[in-house]
Regions:
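N-terminal auxiliary segments of SAM/dcSAM-dependent transferases
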Residues: 1-75
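SAM-dependent Rossmann-like transferase core, predominantly class I methyltransferases
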Residues: 46, 50, 56, 60-142, ...
């Protein structure tokens, strides 16, 4: 199947649930992740051949998106603070607002600790879910002790 045909099919499927413009953006975001294409690929290579297996999976996933399943759950990953984290329906999808919380926390740590070593720093992330906050704090504050806690059934 040609990429342009897959895009048309995806937009038609998802437009049943979302405005067409938003559906088109969702299709492009999906294809960029699933096929490794980039925005310009959709424009300059409309005859790009998508293998049958990828086309079939994409069509199924477009149906899931039309049923309001978040793209992050379909792809099994979400971006947060410049990193990619695994997600599934048992954890909340990391939000941009939470990135702001991390940025503010890191700024406060920098102003409070100054040049002191992060080894004096202890961070606890309760109800960690995907672990994106704990991992971000650990990676941005080398030497800090980070504890992430959650429960699961």
């Amino acid at each position: 199947m040609f990429l342009r045909d897959l895009i048309k099919k995806g937009v038609a499927t998802i437009s049943a649930a979302y405005p067409e413009r938003e559906a088109r953006e969702m299709v492009f975001a999906y294809l960029d992740r699933a096929l490794g294409t980039q925005r310009h690929t959709h424009i300059i290579e409309p005859d790009y051949e998508v293998c049958e297996k990828d086309a079939e999976k994409s069509i199924i996933d477009f149906g899931r998106m039309a049923a309001f399943e978040p793209l992050q759950y379909i792809m099994g990953q979400a971006d947060f603070y410049g990193r990619t984290f695994k997600v599934n329906p048992s954890v909340l999808i990391p939000r941009p607002e939470t990135e702001l919380l991390c940025r503010e926390t890191l700024q406060r740590i920098a102003s409070s600790f100054g040049n002191r070593k992060n080894s004096d720093l202890k961070i606890v992330d309760l109800c960690t879910g995907s672990g994106c906050i704990a991992w971000t704090m650990a990676l941005e504050c080398p030497g800090a002790e980070v504890l992430a806690v959650d429960i699961s059934d």
